[in-house]
């Protein structure tokens, strides 16, 4: 019979692989769409499109954390086989989202003109921006329901279906965006295309949810006002840390749009897109860990929960640090292959933001396991600290230094907020801060030989790489990756950082993992 450890491990690895496939596909489509948007819209309209998404992301957070709260509660209901509570949660939240959506449309539609006028937009672009931002309110309502059924499937640990829906709708997203831009419909056409894509995604998620939960029903008899308190109580506390994340990733775009020429929003966003690759890939793992941690916590299985935390932290650092070092080394190649030119402002954003984003990744298992077991009050305080620092530092530094001030302010806030979170977690759960830092240092040293080898290669490449040649830059980038990866794997084996426990946990899933174990002396 399959043991509990095997079931958790199998689901965790399966969901990680599905998340990896879905996110890599989505990253690829975003990288494809960005040069397309830039070529048709230009820098200023592209910046307006960035602000459209930034404002939409902020408004999504007005749900007071229902999204992540639902994942936790659905995971617990599923573990208990409680279909009645699932129906009550889905129906109650549907009613809440309808009420919230209608309220936001009525309240914000008239003031979008005032909001758009606050940004450094040219007069001929202002009215177009107003219509674009108003379209974002309609997209927002659809997104609320997408997030609801996405949470239902994630709570049942069916990341295969959520990612299938994501990949499926990405095709009409790319084709639709290209078509409306070719027709000359500009930002208005993109808003219509995005709304249609999210409606299609919602339809797919509902169909998948009915298959996973055949007992799923909606009806007035399932509305439970008493459930709202539990959902909001957990979600509101967790939401503070998520708002802090949103501020660190998006507030600078708003501040830049307010205080400096609008083109700097474009430069910042392009740098953030490259840096977000570092942030996004490890979060593939977190999305799979969160419901698994909730399930283990509901069973009081603390031994496997802490094994998940300790080993997960090591695997996370082994994955994220080479991506960070690789991003530092190859930022110029990435930009030349992607956009056809290297902008000093965009490259500077990549260096600062990738470092800041990595600080969040380095404590990612702290935040994810903590949220899974209900440890959210401290995350709320860390989020508040990070938010205040980010807004204060970025605003002051932008006024004093311009564009670079936003980069320095965000990096400072991320370093301080995540350091506080790690210290409090280790204190509350009797974990070792020194052990965490030693592991970070050890993995960094493992990366030193491949990083130095790659640096020598890049210095050699710089002597012959033609400026503006995308193909040559891509070839040089692939060559650097081809040099770094085998050198890194050899360094892992030589260092002995992986042990027999790792082989027992992952040996059935990762081909030839045993070859990375150091041979006994």
Regions found by a protein language model. Name each.
Residues 1-12, 187, 205-249, 288, ...:
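Interhelical loop/hinge segments that connect adjacent transmembrane helices in multipass membrane
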Residues 1-31, 84-92, 126-130, 205, ...:
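N-terminal membrane topogenesis motif
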Residues 1-6, 431-433, 455-521:
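Membrane-proximal transmembrane or re-entrant/amphipathic helices at the cytosolic face
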Residues 8-76, 102-109, 139, 169, ...:
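Signature of the first transmembrane helix
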Residues 12, 141-166, 188, 354-386:
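Membrane-interface junctions at transmembrane-helix termini in multi-pass inner-membrane proteins
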Residues 14-31, 169, 193-201, 205, ...:
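Transmembrane helical elements of multi-pass membrane transporters/channels
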Residues 64-80, 94, 155, 213-217, ...:
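Helix-loop junctions and terminal segments of transmembrane helices
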Residues 134, 163-212, 234, 275, ...:
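Hydrophobic alpha-helical transmembrane segments
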